């Protein structure tokens, strides 16, 4: 299998039990997760040598986060230790007409102070096949931006395929929007595989087309073949992949996705999901697609693998997707009815 490197923040997640509100909570359930950490876990479970890069504090909470990753076969040997704290986010799980709610407490977390010299990037990217990062990491701080850029450049020096999930988070875009768009747009020259669509590109990269409002306009335009291909060609991606989510309620979603390449546009299977936990669903989708590409499935089968992996993730509490390749393949071959396997 392939050697995959991911870079990002792993956070402590605290959630009231079940569907309780924050105001009701007297205790919290603990999970660990983060966009790139979630991808690292899934790819390790699919059999790849999965290396996670981050900076994590030298305390019991940091140790617990690393222990969680190691227990799922993620290579943590290149994680830098130090800094003040692990980022925290509080998640209130929604239900029916009440949406989920997230409160972040991540200021001055260790990853925001990480520097390129703390990582032996030449050794890390030696013999690597894929590097994955998201648009979350470089906008966390100036230091995180410099680390991300250094990793992107080093990956390309070693001829490593680069995957980038635009992953827009509004709470990280409250200031210097044009500066952040310019910074991420410049990073796209290193990117081969991009997860996003025209709306994500407009928000994160400042992408525009004459006469079209991708941010506030009709969403279907942002994911149709014409405009997906325009984004693909503008940034010279090999693949542009998007999810297609129809939120019927906080508990029930329609789920699908599409992939665009220079010579193909393919919309995948439609799923109807009853949601246990949707956090990490997009990361499971990305990791499933990447596994498909690494396993030479081709873009269409890779998309279906990603959709099925993410569909299963929506049934699992926590950020991480505890599944195997065989379970995903069984889902693809089934009608998704969830019958008991004996």
Name what the model sees in each region.
Residues 49-136, 328-342:
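Conserved N-terminal subdomain of the carbohydrate kinase-like
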Residues 31, 38-49, 292-295:
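Alpha-helix C-terminal capping segments
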Residues 172-263:
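Conserved phosphate/ATP/ADP-binding segment of small-molecule kinases
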Residues 1-21:
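Positively charged, low-complexity intrinsically disordered leader regions
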Residues 265-335:
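Conserved post-catalytic alpha-helical subdomain immediately downstream of the catalytic base
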Residues 21-39:
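Short catalytic helix/loop segments, enriched in acidic residues and glycine
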Residues 157-161, 235-238:
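A short helix->loop->beta-strand "cap" motif at the edges of active sites that frequently abuts
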């Amino acid at each position: 299998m392939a050697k995959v490197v991911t870079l990002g923040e792993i956070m402590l997640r605290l959630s009231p039990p079940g569907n309780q509100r924050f105001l009701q909570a007297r205790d919290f359930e603990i999970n660990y997760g983060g966009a790139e950490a979630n991808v690292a876990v899934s790819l390790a479970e699919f059999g790849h040598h999965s290396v996670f890069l981050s900076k994590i504090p030298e305390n019991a909470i940091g140790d617990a986060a690393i222990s969680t990753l190691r227990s799922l076969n993620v290579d943590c040997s290149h994680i830098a230790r130090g800094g003040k704290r692990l980022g925290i986010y509080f998640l209130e799980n929604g239900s029916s007409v009440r949406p989920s709610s997230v409160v972040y407490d991540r200021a001055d977390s260790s990853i925001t102070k990480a520097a390129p010299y703390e990582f032996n990037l030449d050794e890390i990217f030696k013999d690597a096949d894929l590097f994955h990062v998201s648009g979350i990491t470089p906008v966390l701080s100036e230091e995180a931006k410099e680390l991300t850029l250094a990793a992107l450049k080093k990956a390309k020096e070693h001829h490593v395929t680069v995957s980038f999930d635009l992953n827009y988070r509004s709470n990280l875009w409250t200031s210097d929007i044009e500066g952040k768009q310019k910074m991420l747009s410049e990073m796209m020259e290193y990117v081969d595989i991009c997860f996003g669509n025209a709306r994500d590109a407009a928000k994160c990269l400042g992408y525009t087309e004459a006469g079209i409002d991708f941010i506030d306009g009709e969403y279907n335009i942002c994911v149709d073949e014409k405009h997906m291909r325009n984004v693909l060609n503008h940034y010279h991606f090999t693949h542009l992949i998007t999810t297609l989510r129809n939120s019927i309620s906080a508990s029930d979603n329609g789920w699908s996705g599409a992939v665009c390449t220079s010579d193909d546009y393919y919309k995948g299977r439609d799923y109807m999901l009853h949601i246990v936990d949707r956090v990490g669903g997009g990361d499971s989708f990305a990791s499933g697609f990447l596994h498909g590409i690494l396993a030479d499935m081709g873009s269409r089968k890779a998309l279906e693998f990603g959709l099925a992996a993410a569909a299963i993730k929506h049934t699992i509490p926590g950020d991480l997707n505890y599944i195997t390749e065989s379970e995903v393949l069984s889902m693809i071959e089934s009608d998704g009815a969830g019958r008991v396997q004996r």
